[in-house]
């Protein structure tokens, strides 16, 4: 690959065709992440008949990369896309395992506020149900519920620097408003996440203790102490750091006596999230912090992430969330060059631990676990990003649907997408 990019070769060596359905890749160096889906080896293919006619420097801005045009691969081909609304799939007549049993699949974006009534009416066959509405949907009789731990989490992050495009790396600002680790830890200990999960999400969402999720059972440290609700400890941390209430108004000032106001941003989601955002503000006020909602309201999701990715200087703290994929390597999200390192926090210790996780030494299982535990403890101690809610995803499946499970399209699945079928022309109601 290197010789090809440097113009020393007109082809990429190390790619071997085994048969019509198998390709073997030869690497100069092996990394532990290669043992996992998505870890260092792309889980997608690029259609040569499309990209051969587009200059490489234009790939990133091309319609096929930006999603304006789509080429499908698998049991179904993409028939049409309505941006932000729906995707229609049709059976791939040439699928190597045989023609799918369904002629067409229509995926639509539906408001969480409407999905319960839509499923009750039989308007959709499969839907992920909003945890906050569990009481409203739990007794539906025309569906079967399947559940699995969702490999994703919500978090509170602190804006600690910027992404330097010219250098292609994150640069931490030692003078950032949230630079004091005691301030960050205090904001974590102020939150009663388990109570929020119970009251707002019916216990289907709950707190976690680490940025490595239980989903990664081989390296997750279940014994690590997380940021459990402890407002007294939060107050003590702030006192020790020099954030004190000097004028008796119940709110703490900066160490130099100036007014401390923290701007907090959150994306617009559902009613439960709106309640949670307001509760965050109240919990932080209880420990003496003046935290104000940036713009006075939550922000539409696309606009929110644009502000985060461009390091809006007016945002000090933000609540967001993401899926974790199948490779737990923290360098993917928190490394020096990781664009998704939205807190922009980098230090030598963290970088060194991540190098160990990505080293050949980590092929040793015991060493791998040791390195991951070390990074989890480091991340908790530095509190650049605090995990809040994880949970179980509940999927409602209409009773006419056959051969569906929560692990479909993964190696653990007993069902494959092309086998999915329905037993009647109309949905159960």
Language-model features: where?
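Append "and occasionally in soluble cytosolic enzymes with long acidic Gly/Pro-rich linkers
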Residues: 90, 177-282
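A bilobed periplasmic-binding-protein/Venus flytrap-type ligand-binding module shared by bacterial periplasmic
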Residues: 90-93, 152-182, 199, 392
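Ligand/substrate-recognition segments at binding pockets and active sites
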Residues: 83, 244-321, 393
